[in-house]
């Protein structure tokens, strides 16, 4: 994440928090430390950036749930996984930007799309939605700026 984009995200967050908490001095606002070195960090930065620009964005959790197996006396004897009910291959972020559905798959490092994710991408694009693979924050911001100016 370059300095300009990091500062831009910080400025957006300060503006939002100044409006929400007008009596708190800027120096005392609790600001988020954004980074894009991990998938979690990049997802958080992108989601925040979209929201702070006045659009809708949400993180999609596609992971199942771990459940304890218990005997009748309540003793835990193991764990089973309940599958997620979300669509297989769903993107990490679902957003609405300029009234259009935008799905963003976050990939950091050597991560690649699974076959299910490629099928999901085809389904979204065939339906008229926008699908984007974000590898780092700077390229996402570049895409975002072009997209909102169309």
Residue ranges and their predicted role:
Residues 1-150:
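Catalytic phosphate/metal-binding cores of nucleic-acid and nucleotide-processing enzymes, i.e., regions
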């Amino acid at each position: 994440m370059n300095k300009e984009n990091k500062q831009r995200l910080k400025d957006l967050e300060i503006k939002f928090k100044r409006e929400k908490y007008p009596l708190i001095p800027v120096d005392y606002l609790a600001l988020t430390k954004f980074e894009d070195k991990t998938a979690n960090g990049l997802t958080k930065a992108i989601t925040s950036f979209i929201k702070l620009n006045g659009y809708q964005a949400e993180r999609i959790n596609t992971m199942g749930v771990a459940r304890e197996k218990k005997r009748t006396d309540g003793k835990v004897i193991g764990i089973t996984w309940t599958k997620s009910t979300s669509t297989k291959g769903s993107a990490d972020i679902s957003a609405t930007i300029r009234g259009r559905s935008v799905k963003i798959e976050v990939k950091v490092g050597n991560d690649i799309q699974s076959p299910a994710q490629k099928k999901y991408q085809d389904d979204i694009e065939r339906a008229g939605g926008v699908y984007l693979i974000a590898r780092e924050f700077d390229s996402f911001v570049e895409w975002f700026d072009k997209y909102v100016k169309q």
